[in-house]
Amino acid sequence: MIFLTLSLVLLTLVAYYINNRSLVSPSILFCGGMTIASFIAWINQKTWNLELDIRTLLVITLGAVEFILVGYITNFIFNIIYSRTRTQKMVPYNGIPEYINKRFRSVLLIQLIILCVAIFTIRQTTGISNLMSAINYINYIQNGFIKGQINLPSYFGIILLFNNAAGIMAGYVFLENIIVKRKFDFILFSNLLLGLATPLLTGARGDSIVFLIALTILGYFIVKEQNNWNSANTKYVVVGIIGVILFVFVFEWSASLVGRNMENSNLGEYISTYMGAEIANLNEFIKNRSFPIKGEIFGQQTFVTILPTLSRVFQFTLPDYKLDIPFQILNGHNTGNVATMYYSWLYDFGYMGIGILTIVVSSVGEVCYKFAKQSNGFRIIKLIYSYIGALIALSFFSNRFFENLNVNFLYMIILWIVLKYILFRREKNA
């Protein structure tokens, strides 16, 4: 484990310097997440009786090397093409006019109405009047802890998506007010909080985590556009570490809110399970199972949220199947049922899948990052990259990239475009 951890630390440093010391480039987000997970797994090596298989070591390290190389090549090609179409020059930061802040009051009203509708829908669908109990019930069914079926209305997911999309957009404006204008706007902060909290209504904290990471990336963009992209990052690293520590405590507390059993878990064990056990679980999968595993349909583990949309578009029957993500018990300790993004890829496509899908994730992330970095002020592409960057940062946890980049993400982009058109229009006298 120590060799894996040191290798990932070295690769993270390489990614940092070849990306002009940016803390939010795809390579840094990917390698940084894997490094943290590896370090925590190393600490728990004896606890979990973790004996790292050479194949696991190669999958993780070579996967990281490939991710960095693909990102570097994509960046090189992008710079060649981009330099031919646009002359690089320094421009002042394009701030958001004050009147736009006031328009988010209407958005807040819509978000509050959606929150009330969502709560009413949850209670009506589950038949449980207590909201926390209803949320816990939904969470238990969705995770397969209890048998049952929840048939939420088709509009439910869309209205929650609106709150999330509006929250991220308001979050950018809020952060600009804090960073550039040194001003705290309560309305924008409320927009942000509703966007952050709304996913918890289904008992899922994953989208709230993506939300927080996306806001961190957006804040970094705003800060760097005020200064220089090559300036030192020491204070941002310190702030980031403090933020992570605070987040861990809040994250543990939120577990009971969405129905997770915390009675037999301490903070250290909890952190280890969510931020390091993925390496151990991947190692168990590689050691004990043969792959790729032939399923009922192509890519059923990797493209689980994309296949339903494709089945409707191309009119093919999608078999009813369940994800094969068993919970692991290592040396008497529950290490959960997630095993990095590599688990799904190996399960469906074997080692070849890692080679191909790493190219997809790295190149898509790098292109979006470059467009976001080249833009000035508020742009939709920054919101898009902040979301994609958050998914890449969570690669150490699970296959978030392909799980979240589905039709709902397209709806989110459409919502951002519509909201920008409505909220960011110039005033007649502006």
Outline where the language-model segments fall.
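Small-residue-enriched transmembrane helix-hairpin modules in multi-pass membrane proteins
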Residues: 137-156, 241-364
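Membrane-embedded catalytic interface detector for glycan/lipid assembly enzymes
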Residues: 80-236, 244-258
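Hydrophobic alpha-helical transmembrane segments
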Residues: 2-20, 66, 70, 107-119, 172-179, 194-202, 345-347, ...
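N-terminal "leader" segments that precede or initiate the main folded domain
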Residues: 1-101, 188-195, 211-254, 399-430
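Hydrophobic alpha-helical segments
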Residues: 334-430
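Alpha-helical transmembrane segments of integral membrane proteins, especially early/N-terminal helices
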Residues: 19-37, 71, 116-127, 207, ...
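Membrane-interface helix-loop-helix junctions at transmembrane boundaries of multi-pass membrane enzymes
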Residues: 20-25, 172-188, 370-383
